[in-house]
Amino acid sequence: MSNLFDSDSPTNLAEYSVSELSGSIKRTVETAFDQVRVRGEISGYRGPHSSGHAYFALKDDRARIDAVIWKGTFSRLKFRPEEGMEVIATGKVTTFPGSSKYQIVIETLEPAGAGALMALIEERKRKLGAEGLFDAARKKRLPFMPKVIGVVTSPTGAVIRDILHRISDRFPVHVLVWPVKVQGEGAGDEVANAIRGFNALEPGGAIARPDVLIVARGGGSLEDLWSFNDEIVVRAAAESRIPLISAVGHETDWTLIDYAADVRAPTPTGAAEMAVPVKAELEAQATALAARLQGCINRQMDQRRQSVRALMRALPSLDQLLALPRRRFDEAAAGLGRGLELNTINKRRGFERVASHLRPDVLSNRIAERRQLLNDRMARAERTVERLLDRSKSRIDRAEAILASLPTRLKTQTDRGRERLGNLTRHADTAIRHQLTRARAELSAQDRVLQSLSYKNVLKRGYAVIRDEDDRPVSQAAALSAGMGIAIEFADGRVGAMTTEGGTPPAGAKKRSAKPADPTKQGSLF
């Protein structure tokens, strides 16, 4: 019986150790697949590791291969890998002898055609749109004249120069630039952080908070603009409390940030034009408005001056206003003296009449009493005159004060009168229109009544009107005599006729008896 473990059995196979075999396989694989291109779908991608390397797998419907992108290569990629993205990877296949595994070390990575990226964009667009990030109700209006503009873009290149130059030409304002990467690894994070950073600034802080933001980048391929399709960028733009203008690429380039932004500009230069107005145009408009305003003010002032002059011409002068009070005062003063004098004379005469009938002692007493009474009355009269003079003087002072304030009061009353006149004019216009409407309606009704009462309508029913030789209507047969020419008026015309006999009075008519004339008495014409 042969020994199965007999080492002396003849063989042609070389004997390898595990390490030798693994090393041989490694050399064979790496030599045969030193540079390969693999098409597949990214699976298990979780972003770069803390070390900066990225680990994931490429798969199709029947197989799977592990893949790795080293940190240095990952930073040079034009776009960020994403789960489910179909890509074409270029690199080399390596093995690990310690675990008998192989993987592809990716050196370049590109989407598997623009269709794959567009499909990914459409899927992301539907997802974010379903969340309401693109709703028109979320859009904010741009400020007409911002004081501070925040720009998120690369600090180098033509984009920032074009924006600054355009703003300086149109309306120079303060511009804050937040420098970011606009392409490659980390570009999306930097753009999103810049948008959130501007929104985090407090109004009135050490750094002025922008009134409007511009996120800008020059044109490029779909891969170059891919950072602006990142979900983190789109969400930051939609959450921005500051109005945001997106200006990514050329007019034909659309990215997802364009849908989330409040306004999309076709180019970075167009964004600058949307952000600020043209200063020269505003100055021209302000000058034109100022000229119109000054013209209106001048016209109003001229009208007011003319109105005041007309009112002043209509007002009497100060002397005319004071003439009547002065005359009355003078007449009162003159009359008072004469009245006192006449009163004194009358009293003295009465006193003399009474004194002739009195005894000397009684007369002396009465004279003393009357003299005292007269003195008292004279004192009261003097006080009365003084009071009257004081009152007249006070009235004159008040009249002068009223005359001094008369222009102001007249202006106030004129303004009120003008306002009342305007109101009365409008009310009168409305009332006149109503009255005209009612008058027209009444006239129309009366016209209809007049038409219904017109004798022409009666003639149409077969009647006729008889007129005498003077064209006067004949209403009684007795008014006609034989041989008189008459006209018969019908509805359609007139015919002439001749009466053959005189008219007979009605049966109930009585002839008036004639009184005999008195030959001895002249008749009266009346």
Swiss-Prot record:
What job does this protein perform? Bidirectionally degrades single-stranded DNA into large acid-insoluble oligonucleotides, which are then degraded further into small acid-soluble oligonucleotides.
Q: Which GO terms describe its biological process?
A: DNA catabolic process
Say which family it is in: Belongs to the XseA family.
Identify this protein by name: Exodeoxyribonuclease 7 large subunit
Q: What is its main location?
A: cytoplasm
Q: Which GO terms describe its molecular function?
A: exodeoxyribonuclease VII activity; nucleic acid binding
Reported EC number(s) for this entry are: 3.1.11.6
Q: Which residues cross the membrane?
A: none
> What is this enzyme's class at the first EC digit?
hydrolase
User: Its quaternary structure?
Assistant: Heterooligomer composed of large and small subunits.
Q: Where in the cell is it found?
A: Cytoplasm
